[in-house]
A protein has these predicted regions:
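Acidic, metal/ion-handling microdomains and their immediate structural contexts
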Residues: 79
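Membrane-interfacial hairpin junctions
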Residues: 145-147
Length: 218
């Protein structure tokens, strides 16, 4: 998937824009929420979501479990090498290195994310995908201290199940989310569309996320 590159070469604006567009196509919900983060934090969120995209799509691009495990190990090794000051020749790996070096992403959190997606892949059960951990990691990019971890753990599985059309359960009614973490979780509000079997159009998504950003109600 890629070899070592010069770790001193940062991604260009064009390369960052390409990753950003990739997330817009692959995960518009989270992408919309991330627009409300500050510029530096937004890049960290996009790097995080780009890793999640690479991990989530393993089940779609391999035909054998062993090949999937190789891909998960590739990303596990890529994060470990970043900790050692090296980086692989892959735009997402380079993005992760920049954000790890800046202190906005933590290698331990990324390893846990990889483990979670691998566990879901091996079990052939998407309900085990680490949606809550992904949201918690995103929230911690925005602020290291908040009192909404339990709420994120509670609501994330309902959002993801509804978005996959696996469940029509709305899940918990929550108190408003703290303002600093809203760009990490505002898209959870879209569950109200998904439980009704609706596919909101881009404008509906943006308005719903904006309401969540303003009110904290997801």
């Amino acid at each position: 998937m890629g070899c070592m590159s010069n770790p001193t070469n940062p991604l260009s604006e064009t390369q960052w824009a390409a990753i950003d567009k990739r997330i817009l196509r692959a995960d518009e919900d989270r992408w919309i929420s991330s627009r409300y983060a500050g510029a530096s934090e937004r890049r960290a969120l996009i790097a995080l979501y780009a890793l999640a995209y690479e991990l989530a799509r393993v089940r779609l691009v391999v035909t054998e479990e062993g090949l999937g495990l190789i891909r998960f190990q590739w990303w596990r090794d890529a994060v470990s090498e970043i900790e050692a000051g090296k980086v692989r020749e892959h735009d997402v790996a380079k993005a992760l290195k920049e954000e790890i070096d800046a202190g906005r992403l933590k290698p331990g959190a990324l390893h846990k994310l990889i483990d979670g997606y691998q566990g879901a892949f091996e079990a052939e059960d998407r309900s085990l995908e680490p949606e809550a951990w992904l949201a918690l990691t995103a929230a911690n990019v925005l602020t290291p201290i908040h009192d909404w971890a339990e709420e994120i753990r509670d609501v994330a599985p309902y959002f993801s199940a509804a978005r996959r059309s696996d469940s029509k359960a709305f899940g918990p009614i929550l108190t408003p989310a703290p303002k600093p973490i809203r760009p990490a979780i505002a898209h959870f509000r879209l569950r109200k569309f998904y439980i009704e079997g609706k596919t909101p159009n881009p404008l509906q998504k943006r308005l719903s996320v904006l309401q969540a950003i303003r009110s904290g109600k997801v």
